[in-house]
From Swiss-Prot:
InterPro entries for the chain: Epimerase_deHydtase, NAD(P)-bd_dom_sf, UDP_G4E
EC number, as in UniProt: 5.1.3.2
Catalytic activities: UDP-alpha-D-glucose = UDP-alpha-D-galactose
Species, as recorded: Yersinia enterocolitica
Gene3D superfamilies: NAD(P)-binding Rossmann-like Domain, UDP-galactose 4-epimerase, domain 1
One biological process term in Gene Ontology: galactose metabolic process
Protein name (record): UDP-glucose 4-epimerase
GO molecular function, one term: UDP-glucose 4-epimerase activity
Length: 336
């Protein structure tokens, strides 16, 4: 049996593909390569000596999905595919709903036709909107999201919940990620944003290597100790291992888990720690807040620990060192 991973050439997807291949699983990847590179999968094969089956296609393309399900004995699906930039989603809401919501419905319909009943959905901590309290548990209120990206994740979660009630023999889990950072310790795969990075750590590493002149810190007037936004940063390899733990522990019905460390760090703290660990100076300017950003957000990961036996093992130092190693080895990402 094989596992279909949509968006498997992307940042989190490629690290998850690697983790599953290393565990001896058979993997099929579907990716349209709009925000990713097939080179990531070539690097995965270099690391572990095994190759996934790769399809260059889109989750909105029913014929492509039918081909995959008819050509492989798919047992379960891990669904990463989708657009993911908070800022861009504010500018292009229709594209986000089309890709993230309609695409997920299309995938689910084709899974039903192929009688594939196990699904892990890549959700996000953005579903919590403006948090009423931190740390966030899975029982916290969702909705009230501040951007279409987050809203699209809320919508898909609700669709999956409703579907699960109508089809109790399906096993569906939504994983709410916090802020993935870092890279595989080999330095061969990592985060390779198109254009200027939207996420903090690749922005920092590109400044450190001289690709960008300075970092932009979006807001220093939040109600936090140093005025900058606080987030729960989690090593991408911990996140990948979280998918393996979820796959092993899938049960019928609909489940939700936070995947985070349970510790929040501010933007300014991240800059200082990176400078301390690497010895690189990171010049930055304070600019106005981005639309849709919130002051602070970090997880309570206790439920995943209790029910999946999973917890984040890697430290902030690991995250920063691995991200920097990836950047130094790949100054232009996968476009070497």
């Amino acid at each position: 049996m094989s596992i279909l991973i949509t968006g498997g050439a992307g940042y989190i997807g490629s690290h998850t593909v690697l983790t599953l291949l290393e565990q001896g699983r058979n993997v099929v990847v579907l990716d349209n390569l709009i925000n990713s590179s097939a080179e990531s999968l070539a690097r995965v094969s270099k690391i572990c000596g095994r190759k996934p089956n790769f399809y260059h296609g889109d989750i909105l393309d029913r014929s492509c999905l039918k081909l995959i399900f008819s050509s492989h004995k798919i047992d379960s699906v891990i669904h990463f595919a989708g657009l993911k930039s908070v800022g861009e989603s504010v500018e292009k809401p229709i594209e986000y709903y089309q890709n993230n919501v309609v695409g997920s419905i299309t995938l689910l319909e084709e899974m039903c036709l192929a009688n594939v009943k196990k699904l892990i959905f890549s959700s996000s901590a953005t579903v919590y909107g403006e948090p009423e309290f931190v740390p966030l548990t899975e029982k916290a209120r969702i909705g009230g999201t501040t951007n279409p990206y987050g809203t699209s994740k809320v919508m898909v979660e609700q669709i999956l919940k409703d579907f699960s009630l109508a089809h109790p023999d399906y096993s569906i889990t939504a994983l709410r990620y916090f802020n993935p950072v870092g890279a595989h310790p080999s330095g061969l795969i990592g985060e390779d944003p198109n254009g200027k990075p939207n996420n903090l750590l690749p922005f920092i590493t590109q400044v450190a290597i001289g690709k960008l002149s300075k970092l932009l810190v979006y807001g220093n007037d939040y109600d936090t100790p140093d005025g900058s936004g606080i987030r729960d940063y989690i090593h991408v390899m911990d996140l990948a291992e979280g998918h393996l733990s979820t796959l092993i522990n899938l049960t019928s019905g609909f489940r939700i888990y936070n995947l985070g460390t349970g510790v929040g760090y501010s933007v300014l703290h991240m800059i200082k720690e990176f400078e301390r660990i690497t010895g690189k100076n990171i010049p930055f300017d304070i600019v106005s807040r981005r639309p849709g950003d919130i002051a602070e957000c970090w997880a309570s990961p206790e439920l995943a620990h209790l029910e999946l036996g999973w917890y984040a093992k890697r430290t902030l130092v690991d995250m920063l060192q691995d991200a920097w190693k990836w950047q130094k080895m790949n100054p232009n990402g996968y476009n070497c």
